[in-house]
Amino acid sequence: MRRIYLNTYEQINKVKKILRKHLKNNLIGTYMFGSGVESGLKPNSDLDFLVVVSEPLTDQSKEILIQKIRPISKKIGDKSNLRYIELTIIIQQEMVPWNHPPKQEFIYGEWLQELYEQGYIPQKELNSDLTIMLYQAKRKNKRIYGNYDLEELLPDIPFSDVRRAIMDSSEELIDNYQDDETNSILTLCRMILTMDTGKIIPKDIAGNAVAESSPLEHRERILLAVRSYLGENIEWTNENVNLTINYLNNRLKKL
């Protein structure tokens, strides 16, 4: 746990306890991935959890997880020291043999808060983004509960499927970047480098790398996104973000 900032330890420990208490013997393993175990958590980084279970969850179990996680996850617009929790559950047997897109059993994320308040319970679904997530998590993760390394539970994921998932995800991203400018710009930068190198690179590093090879106008906006990601308050209202989003998307399509 020493690689993860100490002020997040209590959140991580509470998530771990919630999963053990309510999933019981169905729980195979809990793993952290993303910036928390790669380049280090940034001011606005999520805590990313991948949870592997052996059997489907009931709606009641999912509802309990939502009720228990909500109080310990940062809310959008909140100024507390909590971090956003993003938690994905998969069924191990549904990963073997591998098929793209994979099945997602459950998802918790703060962008779903309004739906949770209306009684929404995430159902099993195919999720193209999950291919990217699993590819990233398998390459680098930290086991916080369970007897198996994640690499033992997941099959090999062809990079051709990662490329397909990136192209699928980019289309949705460029249609929904408003009010999420920083994340959208840097995610596109990371997609570009992933397509080029086969590696999932931290967003700030990806942003700096793509900025270096971008025209000045777009370079400046990308570097603004990096500064925002690192904690600076950036006002996007007067920036022509759509121009840089389109530039990055066109660059991605050429790879």
From Swiss-Prot:
One of its GO terms (molecular function) is ATP binding. Coiled coil: none annotated. InterPro entries: AadA_C, NT_sf, Polymerase_NTP_transf_dom. Keywords: Antibiotic resistance, ATP-binding, Nucleotide-binding, Nucleotidyltransferase, Plasmid, Transferase. It catalyses: spectinomycin + ATP = 9-O-adenylylspectinomycin + diphosphate. GO terms for biological process: response to antibiotic. NCBIfam families: ANT_9 (NF012212). Mediates bacterial resistance to the antibiotic spectinomycin but not streptomycin. This is Spectinomycin 9-adenylyltransferase.
